[in-house]
Swiss-Prot record:
The chain crosses the membrane at residues 27-49. Its main location: membrane. Residues 55-123 form the POTRA domain. The gene is ftsQ. It comes from Anaeromyxobacter sp. (strain K). Residues 1-26 are cytoplasmic. This is Cell division protein FtsQ. It comes from the Bacteria. Keywords: Cell cycle, Cell division, Cell inner membrane, Cell membrane, Membrane, Transmembrane, Transmembrane helix.
Length: 294
């Protein structure tokens, strides 16, 4: 005998669904409320952080300055006091500061209370180079600014490089400039600066290097064998000092006899100059007004 539908079962289904939905809502409600709270807190934090002065840069501190001034750097900087600490670009600021001719490197760091700490390294000028005007060159061989009286620097001058040639072929001429700077370094390391200070270095790709001292002595080094030539030069200057002599010209550029030093000697100290001549050969020390040394 067939039975009709179970009305009690059918009637019970909607009630079970409502109870399941209620249980699910009860379980999910804490998570929903937590997410809402976090969203509200984030929105509030954003508004407070952005609109309030709590995270505004109060100070920009520059460290490592000697030549550049804080105001010059602030004029270059895209970041200023009052900018928001969290949304400024420290890399862009560092790049802008490096456009100052004296600045070699810059690192920007956020600090709290809201401020910026900028660590700077300035260029170290090693010489002047004549490029149709005097320019400063640093110890890495980079020409970085035109020299002005306010720089207050007494540096040797590198000559022999034409401005037009430098502008067109800097890469080809850079070794000449680098060689002159290396010579200055070796001159100082050998203690020669205590005997004679270099005032000018003339570089020539064909004939090599010629120096002039503050006393007016011309020193023709030529090309190659720098260390050996400086050793011989040191020995010659010591011998001249012992004899009370001063050289007008020293030749260390004899390609046929590279181990020789030809000296044109000026007058003895206290005596007038002009009684000197070039020597073609000789012994081991200054003799009279001229000599050749090995």
């Amino acid at each position: 005998m067939a039975r009709g539908p179970n009305r009690r079962r059918v009637d019970r289904v909607p009630g079970e669904r409502r109870r399941r939905l209620a249980r699910a809502m009860a379980l999910a409600l804490p998570s929903i409320l937590a997410l809402a709270a976090l969203g509200g807190a984030a929105t509030l934090g954003w508004r407070v952080g952005w609109k309030s002065d709590l995270l505004r840069v109060r100070e920009i501190r520059f460290e490592g300055l000697s030549r550049a001034t804080p105001q010059e750097l602030l004029d270059l900087s895209p970041v200023q006091p009052g900018d928001h600490l969290l949304f400024l670009d420290t890399d862009a600021m560092a790049a802008a500061l490096r456009r100052h001719p004296w600045i070699a490197s810059a690192q920007v760091r956020r600090t709290f209370p809201p401020a910026l700490e900028v660590q700077l390294a300035e260029r170290r000028p090693a010489a002047l180079v004549d490029l149709g005007g005097l320019y400063l060159v640093d110890d890495r061989g980079e020409v970085f600014k035109r020299a002005v009286p306010g720089d207050g620097l007494d540096l040797p001058v590198i000559t022999g490089i034409e401005r037009e040639a430098w502008a067109e072929g800097r890469g080809e001429l850079a070794p000449l400039l680098g060689g002159a700077l290396a010579l200055l370094g070796r001159w100082s390391a050998r203690g020669l600066d205590a005997r004679s200070t270099i005032s000018e270095i003339h570089v020539d790709p064909e004939y090599g290097t010629t120096l002039w001292s503050d006393e007016g002595t011309e020193i023709r080094l030529g090309q190659g064998d720098l260390e050996e030539k400086l050793t011989r030069l040191h020995r010659v200057l010591s011998a001249l000092d012992a004899e009370g002599e001063r050289a007008e010209v020293l030749h260390l550029d004899n390609r046929r006899r590279p181990d020789w030093v030809a000296v044109r000697v000026a007058g003895r100290r206290g005596e007038p100059d002009g009684r000197s001549s070039y020597a073609a050969g000789g012994g081991g020390g200054p003799q009279g007004r001229s000599s050749s040394l090995r």
